[in-house]
Amino acid sequence: MRLENKTSNMLWFITIVLTVLALSQLIGYWVNSTISENTTIEWSSLIHFTHIRNHGGVFGMLQGMGWIFAVISIGLLIGVSAYLWFSPAIKRYEYISFGFIVGGGASNILDRFVYGSVIDFIDIQHVPYWNYIFNTADVMVHVGIWPLLFFSFFASNDQIDSGIPN
């Protein structure tokens, strides 16, 4: 890949990371400032805002061990960034997808450092066997993961090469 393309793609990556990080932090700050902890506000019959603190990891596992997830996440974010810079054949959609993943992950790490826990608040109702509360950073991680999974399973390299610019 030419250096100009690499630089352009890294700019996409950095822009998305910073945008996701800023938006997620602003929304988390708003939740923390306006909704008391362990309080629910019904936005609609499907979506409630329930302010909780996650001191553990994904789905609240390993409560009180959030620092382990912060350390692991920092290592992963550094690894992904290095992978994007040093790997010779990465497509633009990968830079964009990883931008959402890294931005969301960085936001959750920043929550742990600023608040001592992750601020979760999106509470989906009326879904059987679903009782998890999550945040915008988690949503952004999924926004990044799903295109990576889709293209890796359902698109051939020829389709990706012909339809998506480097």
Residue ranges of predicted features:
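Alpha-helical transmembrane bundles and membrane-interface segments of multipass inner-membrane proteins
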Residues: M1-N166
